[in-house]
Amino acid sequence: MMARAIIKPAGLALLLLLSTQQVAKAQFLDGFGHFQKGEFCEAREAWLDDEPDGDSSSAFGIAETYSRGLCVKEDQIKASRWYLTAALRGFSRGRAEIGIRYAYGKGVEPSAYKSYVWLSIARLTAAKWETDYRENLVVNINLMRRALTAAELSKAEKVIAQYRQTYRMPREFEIL
């Protein structure tokens, strides 16, 4: 009887968690649908509604609006902050974008070291079926590797190895 009493609340908690994730996914998809139709303000609003729930896809969508100046004034610093939010929440394409931004200094201070780390982490976390995306990451990773000193490369490889064990980025990567 006691097991049933524990399982019931746990089951309800799981159901609640799954239902909120479905709402978040639906809001992102709603925003994406608007985005594809060129309804950028509506897309941004849907993503802003979803963002407090911690959805990485919505943070990426908001970043895109700032990066391209869609429904908001173009602001590469704000775009980089939103891409970083998506990256820290686990969105592989957010990780790739912040890596590219560090490579070119777009909205951030240029850093081949941070670019290399973020691009490498993006590759590690990219879906296996995203072959073109993963191949492009490898090209960019190799470009950044050539820009690093031996000491920077060694430090970067340690960060990547640590990430593989903990799935957490060091503090220095949590800020722009």
Description of each model-found segment:
Residues 1-11:
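Bacterial N-terminal signal peptides that target proteins for export
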Residues 16-23:
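C-terminal segment of classical bacterial N-terminal signal peptides
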Residues 27-53:
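Alpha-helical segment of the N-proximal tetratricopeptide repeat
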Residues 29-33, 59-68, 97-104, 122, ...:
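Hydrophobic face of amphipathic alpha-helices that form TPR/SEL1-like repeat modules
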Residues 39, 52-57, 68-70, 75, ...:
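Short helix-capping/linker turns of helical repeat alpha-solenoids
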Residues 132-176:
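Terminal, low-structured helical/coil segments at or just beyond the last alpha-helical repeat
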